[in-house]
Amino acid sequence: MSIFDIGEAVDLLTVLDNREWRSRLQDKLKVTNSDKIVISAKLNIPGPIKNNDILQKIFMDGWQTFVAGFECNSQYEMLFAERATGPEAFITVDGNLAAVKKTAILFEETYALGRLFDIDVMANGQADYQLSREDLGFGPRLCLICGKPAKVCAKEQNHTLDEGYEVINQMYQGATSKELIFEKESQETVVNNALKGLLYEVSLNPKPGLVDPVSMGSHTDMNMFMFIDSSLSLKSYLDKAFKLGRNFEGSDLKLLFNALRAEGVLAEQTMFNATNNANTHKGAIFSLGIWVTAIAYSTKDGSATMTEVRRVIQRMVEGLIEKDLASNRVATTAGEQQFQTYQLTGIRGEAVNGFPGVSEVAVPFLQATFGTMTQRLLDTLMKIAATLEDSTLIKRAKTPDVLAEMKEWTSIYFKLGGSHTEQGMKYLYDLDRLFIERNLSIGGSADTLILTIFIGQLTGLL
């Protein structure tokens, strides 16, 4: 079913009349609220169907998300579902006009259905009233269909209405789908996508303190070529992980994990042989191996939901914290030391809980992103870094207090527009230099990004 199967068609004259009505109301609000900023919002929907129950819900959900970022004592008036041309809303707020415009643009570009919104920000008497997207560090608004500047496509009439409807329907279905589905795939498909996760991560630039194509980051014993060698050396391990999951017949999935872990020990040695004893992917061997095995097991008889895969993972690693961390043995790894010192469970805690940092944070965030592959992955990495108790970061900082700093750094990054603005990217380069100076690294976040890329590739999010 299409969003546009229901609703009353409107003609061009009705649309033009509504434009005049909106302009008069905006002017009135600017006069009666001369010391405030006026924001108006509507949906940018092509064709004659501009209002129905689904479009109203899209608008209300997005509008509520948008206004939640402003002071709760702001006055606002809403006109919703009354006009045949679609729902509209108006709000007056205090603040700096340029900052509010940036907030509106970021909403349009980062909210799952934000690109369907048209938000105008205006005020009397502020010098930056005429600031454009480009003046604020953003690129031009892009066409939903082809990604070229929207003004060019509109002027040249490059696309049909049916093409526009198809893309909007796909966006809506993607944003409202309740859960990711893993289809039954071949060993080659699953393993190749796992390798993509490893290779895409190291190819991404810039990343705070991490190895990338132009920098060793804070890892002076590593470079990108070493990561490529390491990634390729793990193909045999990933093949075995898939076979273990697809062929396992028992009911005690802890036995499946034990078999995987034995292969993981061998894979670590293979990695060290490929990297001259540098630890490039020890964390990924653990986490990526678990996911490959769990997906292969869960989909042996057909498709599986994210929830089903997570339950398999939890059954595989049941009792892992007690076995690895709660014993009285001498701590030999950063994760074990941090559990004994700070009671942080690290990657084992993530695994025991079914990797909530992946399935509840990183993947949903990735699903809502847009732009180039680099932009989407950089923003996703920083979202991960904002929420993860990164054992690599804690180890290098020698204190978990660095996690609060990380939250602040990522908050500044996103307030500046993230990967979609020059200011955001400059900040990320500056942050990379700061990490190198302080010998910090978000290695745990990188491992989580690898998993997210793998899942994104396998399910069609990327």
UniProtKB/Swiss-Prot annotation:
Region ranges (2-(5''-triphosphoribosyl)-3'-dephosphocoenzyme-A synthase): 179-462
EC number assigned by the record: 2.7.7.61, 2.4.2.52
Please tell me whether the keyword RNA-binding is annotated for this protein.
no
Region (Apo-citrate lyase phosphoribosyl-dephospho-CoA transferase) location:
1-178
Q: One biological process GO term for this chain?
A: prosthetic group biosynthetic process
Top-rank lineage group of the source organism: Bacteria
- Write down the InterPro entries for this protein, in alphabetical order: CitG (IPR002736), CitX (IPR005551), TriPribosyl-deP-CoA_syn_CitG (IPR017551)
Keyword list, A-Z? ATP-binding, Multifunctional enzyme, Nucleotide-binding, Nucleotidyltransferase, Plasmid, Transferase
| Molecular-function GO term, any one | holo-citrate lyase synthase activity
Catalytic reaction equation(s) = apo-[citrate lyase ACP] + 2'-(5''-triphospho-alpha-D-ribosyl)-3'-dephospho-CoA = holo-[citrate lyase ACP] + diphosphate; 3'-dephospho-CoA + ATP = 2'-(5''-triphospho-alpha-D-ribosyl)-3'-dephospho-CoA + adenine
The broad enzyme category this protein falls into is transferase
Alphabetized Pfam families for the sequence:
CitG, CitX
Name the protein family: In the N-terminal section; belongs to the CitX family.
Biological role stated in the UniProt entry: Bifunctional enzyme that catalyzes formation of 2-(5''-triphosphoribosyl)-3'-dephosphocoenzyme-A, and then the transfer of this prosthetic group precursor to the apo-acyl carrier protein (gamma chain) of the citrate lyase to yield the holo-acyl carrier protein.
Report the HAMAP family cross-referenced here. Answer: CitG, CitX
Write down the PANTHER family for this protein, in alphabetical order: 2-(5''-TRIPHOSPHORIBOSYL)-3'-DEPHOSPHOCOENZYME-A SYNTHASE (PTHR30201:SF2), TRIPHOSPHORIBOSYL-DEPHOSPHO-COA SYNTHASE (PTHR30201)
Q: List the protein's name.
A: Protein CitXG
Query: Where does this protein come from, organism-wise?
Result: Weissella paramesenteroides
